[in-house]
Amino acid sequence: MLSVSEVNRRIAGLLERHFALGWVRGEISNFTRAGSGHWYFSLKDAGAQIRCVMFKGRNQYADFTPREGEAIEVRALVTLYEARGELQLSVEAIRRAGLGNLYEAFLRLKAALEAQGLFDAARKRPLPRHPHAIGVVTSLQAAALRDVLTTLHRRAPHVPVVVYPVPVQGAGAAERIAAMLDLVNARAEVDVIILCRGGGSIEDLWAFNEEPVARAVAASDIPIVAGVGHETDVTIVDFVADVRAPTPTGAAELVSPDRARMLRDVAGCWDALSATLRRQLDRRAQTVDWLARRLRSPQAQMRERRAGLAHLEGRLRFALHGRVQRAEHGQRLLAMRLDAARPDIARERTALQGIEAALARAMRATLDRAQTRLSHHQAGLELLAPQRTLERGYAVLLDAKGQAIRDPAALHARARIEARLARGAVDIEIAQVQPKLPEM
């Protein structure tokens, strides 16, 4: 009985004896450069493919590095990788055989679309800075979808995400992607579209190199960000899309506003607004102080009016006293003249009574005018009295210390104050402070 290892060794020996070193032509795919420096890739044609390895000691003499989809010729031995029982070509030499069919198709379509202006920068639209909703067109099984959703949730958890599932490789994938893009535009649910899938071979990504997808991207009314494959992968969609991202994660970062940055921007705007309001309040407070210095208080005006009234009263008393003295002096002179002339007593008494009556009338008129002026000034003082002001419907606002409140800036919501009225007082709780009253 043979072991598995023995079977594989015998098969490897048979292959090496029956397949001499020779040239094989095919199209390259799944090219990988290992950390050891070895090259691993597949060589295929329309009907089959085979794995190939070209060790570092051989590939260092190659004059080019193979690319996906490129047609090449290799000089190789048919061998068996015994550890896994896999058939492979051990490549000794490599040379170009011209561009592969896929790559030629890629170049033809690229040239045609570029000539039609589909790659022009002028037709590309800017991405919305703050999208209301983000659409993702990809396969539900794609690993890229998980990366995109994780990135969007981290950066912009407040933005809704709509996933539009569609196959991204295989037969008919291009037509279904194009139809889905048309549907997304018709539904108009999102502000920006991420068209993405993860990395893979040129065959895996080929749907994004087909004309239906390219034209659907160009016809979209909604901006599209292409995030197809890895950074080194280039597809037709990358040229037609409004923005090309190196990876699906990069596409998610491009379309999502950074929540932390937005919060910093809002904080900055709030600080600027607060500073502006503080400056305005400071200027208004300065204006109020300036007006307060110019405005005399009612108490000061009352003191001035009282002083003026006292001055008028003194002048009135002095004037009355002088008139009385002059009248008495005149009376004495008349008496002396009467004694000297010895007039008729009755006639002179009558004249004297007339003079006394005239003097009395003059004194009463003078006193009436003085009383009128005194009443006028008294009425003016009463108008300025705080009690009369309160009786006209006004109120005096006092803080907790009993001080009059002149500036609303000294108050705050829920503060308690006292309103002094003509016939009592009222306790008030502040609901809202308005720094400036509306014009009346």
UniProtKB/Swiss-Prot annotation:
UniProt similarity note: Belongs to the XseA family.
Keywords: Cytoplasm, Exonuclease, Hydrolase, Nuclease
Reported function: Bidirectionally degrades single-stranded DNA into large acid-insoluble oligonucleotides, which are then degraded further into small acid-soluble oligonucleotides.
Subunit description: Heterooligomer composed of large and small subunits.
Places the protein is found: Cytoplasm
UniProt protein name: Exodeoxyribonuclease 7 large subunit
EC number: 3.1.11.6
Gene Ontology molecular-function annotations: exodeoxyribonuclease VII activity; nucleic acid binding
Source taxon at top rank: Bacteria
Any one biological process term the GO annotation gives: DNA catabolic process
